[in-house]
Amino acid sequence: MSIEIQWIGIGAAFLVGAIGGALVRRKVAATQLAEAKRMADQILSEATKEADILRKEAEIQKKDALLEAKTAWEQEAREMRRELQAQEKRLVQREENLDRKVAQVDARDEEFGQREKRLSQQESRIRSWEKEADALVRQQRERLEELAGLGAEEAKAQLMEQMESEARHECAKKIKQIEDEAKEAADKKAQEILALAVQRYAGDFVAESAVSVVPLPNDEMKGRIIGREGRNIRAIEAATGIDLIIDDTPEAVIISGFNPVRREVARLALERLIGDGRIHPSRIEEAVNKATQDVDNAIREAGEQATFDVGVHGIHPEIIKLIGRLRYRTSYGQNVLQHSIEVAFLCGIMAAELGINVKQAKRAGLLHDIGKAVDHEVEGSHAVIGANLARKYGESAKIVHALAAHHEDEKPSTVLAVLVQAADALSGARPGARREMLETYVKRLQDLERIGTSFAGVTNCYAIQAGREIRVMVSSEEVSDVQSHTLAKQIARQIEEEMAYPGQIKINVIRETRAVEFAK
């Protein structure tokens, strides 16, 4: 019994414990539930707030996007409106242009219609005229056939011949008119070009004198120079080959001659005769010989001075003499020695710029015209003559080629030859450096002397009186008195064949025989 009571007590205790535990758990669960509900409410409240915030932000973003889209749409709409307005303006302009063109086309159509109408009327009149003309032609043809007794074909042939003759005549007149007009236009254009060239040309004009003046102590000396019956003046002219002009010029005698060497010899000889006072043929011959020696010395000194000025050394003495003779030569009014020195310096300057041998360039420039120092008895161009002389006196092959090629007698194959060509052209083309008139005059006198000396038996020939007379000195042993007349005619004939000159030229053949004996 007691055991049962114990088990009941235990069971009751377990039951009470279980009920108490259940109540405790329930209370704890209720507390937890309340806490969970509170937390759920708090989370829900926070979520609601965040949702509201997100909704508001979304609405704000939506409004911003709508605003941006609206702004972009409005901008695009404005641009589209502007483009549409521009297109509309262009369309309006195009429409106006089309309207104008349509109006023009309509006007042209109307004008063409009127023209076509006028042309139709004219065509009708022309056809009518053609019919009338055909009828008149038939009538005239029939009448002509009756009057002339010619058939249609014969009349047609004569008419064709007449028309052809008239056409040829008209064509010739037209050609002549065209030629005259072309010539007139060419002359006018040439005058314009020449006038323009003269206006633009500003060079100096320096003439090389062909006369020398010898002062006299008094006018009485003129009579002594002339001598009895003119024997002294004839002796001077015969010995020197120049003209002595004794006129009213007070206390002066003019020496005229195109050869500067002979003119200088005559000047020195005349000054020596005037200073000595003894003037007669034998004394004249001595003075001329002494003056010739003095001029030869001056020529040598001029050549040496030129080589010294240019800075060129080791030149053969004969070439130095040729260089000195250039002092008494001119080319188109330009002194050839000064021209050669100028060419030498120009060659040196250009050679220095190109980096080639300056000394060699100066040497070629100085020697390029030595062929002009040789008298006209030597045939050939001065470039070839100069090259042959340079080769003869030991100049190098480059120098020889430069001399021969500076006037295209040989094709330039070296830089040095081209340099000499360029320097020669620069010096000669300088405004005022050269003049054509004197050179042409001198060339004519040289040709006269060349023709005179080309005949056998001639010892000397001098062109005097400005080329209106040549004096031919012949050897008395080779040419007789009778042959001298024939020689004069032969010289005159050759001058007529080879030269063009105004007026006439006197050929004076002089044959002199001297007999000399000494009394002891």
From Swiss-Prot:
Keywords on record: Cell membrane, Endonuclease, Hydrolase, Membrane, Nuclease, RNA-binding, Transmembrane, Transmembrane helix
List, alphabetically, the GO terms of the cellular component aspect.
Answer: plasma membrane
User: Which intervals hold domain KH?
Assistant: 210-273
Q: Which SUPFAM superfamilies match?
A: Eukaryotic type KH-domain (KH-domain type I), HD-domain/PDEase-like
The record's InterPro entries line, in alphabetical order, gives:
HD/PDEase_dom, HD_domain, HDIG_dom, KH_dom, KH_dom_type_1, KH_dom_type_1_sf, Ribonuclease_Y, RNase_Y_N
Report the superkingdom from the record. Bacteria
EC number(s) stated in the UniProt entry for this protein: 3.1.-.-
What is the protein's membrane topology class? Answer: Single-pass membrane protein
Q: What the protein does? A: Endoribonuclease that initiates mRNA decay.
**What is the protein name for this chain?**
Ribonuclease Y
Record organism: Syntrophotalea carbinolica (strain DSM 2380 / NBRC 103641 / GraBd1)
Task: Cite the source lineage.
Answer: Bacteria, Pseudomonadati, Thermodesulfobacteriota, Desulfuromonadia, Desulfuromonadales
Q: Which gene encodes it?
A: rny
